[in-house]
Design a protein with these regions (language model features):
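Conserved active-site and cofactor/substrate-binding residues in soluble primary-metabolism enzymes
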Residues: 14-17, 30, 55-63, 77, ...
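Secondary-structure boundary elements
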Residues: 70-75, 124-133, 176-184
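Active-site-proximal alpha-helical scaffold in enzymes
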Residues: 109-136, 175
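Conserved beta-ketoacyl condensing-enzyme motif
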Residues: 19, 54-113
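Condensing-enzyme catalytic core mediating Claisen C-C bond formation in acyl metabolism
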Residues: 1-52, 151-208
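Short, well-ordered, mixed-charge alpha-helical segments that flank or form enzyme active sites
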Residues: 91-92, 142-147, 194-199
C-alpha cells in the first residue's frame, strides 16, 4: 500500500479538498484592528446579547459555523462532520454548539492550533473519501479565557504590559470535495507539527 506521505511530517491529499467558504465572527476589539473590515460580523459588546461570557462565545461559534455553511450553499443537514474545539474545559463551546447543530462531531483540543488541526484532519477525512463535506471551527473569548488561565475579570488583577490578549471570536471553514460555489482554496498537503518545549513558564509573557 502506497502511503500518501512526503518526508517525516507531511501528508499529500491527492483529491485536494476545497475550502469552499469561511466565516469569522469577532468582538469589538478585534473589529477595531487592521482586519476589521474583513470579518463577517463584529459584536459590539463582550456578552453579545447573552447572559454570560460562555454563552456569548457559544453564540459566536454557532453564528460563524452557520454563516460558513450558508456561504457554501449548503444546509447543516448536508454537512457530514463537524471538527472543532475551543479553550474551555470539556471544550464546552464546541460541544454544546454541536448538540444544537446535530452534525456528527469530532471534538478537538489543540489550544492555539485547534483551527489548523481541524483543517488537517478534515482534509484527511475528505481525501480518504470518508465524507464529502465537513465544517472546521475554533473559538475563544477573552473573558472566558482569562477566567480559565489567569484571573477572573471580577478579581480585578492588574495586567502586566507583556500579558497576552486572547481573541474574542470564532472562525469556521466549510470543506467540500465538490463545492457548489467557487472555492477559496484547496488543501493539497498538510504538515503536522511536533511539540517543542521552549521553557517559557510565565503565563503573562507567553511571547517571550
Amino acid at each position: 500500500m502506497a502511503l500518501k506521505r512526503i518526508g517525516l511530517q507531511t501528508v499529500e491529499l491527492p483529491l485536494r479538498p476545497a475550502i469552499s467558504a469561511s466565516a469569522a465572527y469577532v468582538g469589538r476589539k478585534e473589529g477595531e484592528g487592521p482586519l476589521g473590515a474583513l470579518f463577517d460580523h463584529v459584536a459590539q459588546d463582550e456578552l453579545y446579547g447573552q447572559e454570560t461570557f460562555e454563552l456569548a462565545e457559544k453564540r459566536l461559534y454557532l453564528d460563524a459555523i452557520r454563516k460558513a455553511i450558508q456561504k457554501g450553499g449548503l444546509q447543516p443537514e448536508n454537512v457530514q462532520f463537524l471538527l472543532g474545539g475551543d479553550l474551555l474545559n470539556q471544550i464546552i463551546t464546541a460541544s454544546f454548539s454541536a448538540r444544537e447543530l446535530g452534525i456528527p462531531f469530532i471534538g478537538l483540543y489543540g489550544a492555539c492550533s485547534t483551527m489548523a488541526e481541524s483543517l488537517c484532519l478534515g482534509g484527511m477525512l475528505l481525501d480518504g473519501e470518508h465524507a464529502s463535506t465537513a465544517v472546521c471551527a475554533a473559538s475563544s473569548h477573552f473573558c472566558t479565557a482569562e477566567r480559565q488561565y489567569r484571573y477572573p475579570l471580577e478579581f480585578g488583577s492588574q495586567r502586566p504590559p507583556t500579558a497576552q490578549w486572547t481573541v474574542t471570536g470564532a472562525g469556521a471553514a466549510l470543506l467540500c470535495l465538490e463545492p457548489s460555489v467557487p472555492p477559496l482554496a484547496h488543501i493539497a498537503r498538510i504538515c503536522m507539527g511536533r511539540v517543542v518545549d521552549l521553557g517559557v513558564s510565565d503565563a503573562n509573557n507567553m511571547g517571550a
